[in-house]
Amino acid sequence: MKKVLSILLLLSINSFADDTNEDVSTIDGIINAYYEVVSGPKGFIFDFETDRLIHAPNAIITRFNENNDFQRHTVAEEHEPLLEPYETSLYEIEVSRVCQEYGNIAHVWSTFAMMETLDSEPFLRGINSISLYFKDGRWWIASWQTQYESDTEVPKKYLPN
């Protein structure tokens, strides 16, 4: 029985590693993972492990909310309020992307919408400005900044055509 459990554990770890490797080997993969870790139904538990794997050590997060209040902190500090399961469902989805890449660095302007369900109207929109670098055969998120839409709408160049 122990042998069977050990084999199952090894298979699940290898599967997780393969999935994570796919997530970070392309810009598409890492940006998709970036949104997947925060989105889920009521009771969803934030995917801390994947979030740690997509961010570089010491990655910095900067956020301007809809009132233009400023926050700047580390990924570890971002995790603190997410320790409990979600009280309501939350889906943050990418609606448009502008990517600029040169060598081992890339910058992604990612317009997002937040919704209570995947088929509901967004209750909030904004732009994530995501800085990436490629090292050791994979992409890393070095930093990201978020600006929630307020009185100033998201510019048309960052919206779907």
Set out the residue ranges of the language-model regions:
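Residues that flank catalytic or metal-binding motifs in active/ligand-binding sites
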Residues: H55-P57, V95, G126-N128
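Surface-exposed, charged secondary-structure patches
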Residues: D23, I60-I61, D69-D119
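Sec-dependent N-terminal signal peptides
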Residues: K3-I13
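Short beta-strand edge/turn micro-motifs at domain boundaries
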Residues: R125-P155
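N-terminal, post-signal-peptide region of Sec/Tat-exported proteins
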Residues: K42-F70
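A short, polar/proline- and glycine-enriched secondary-structure boundary/capping micro-motif
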Residues: R72-T74, L118-P122, D151-Y158
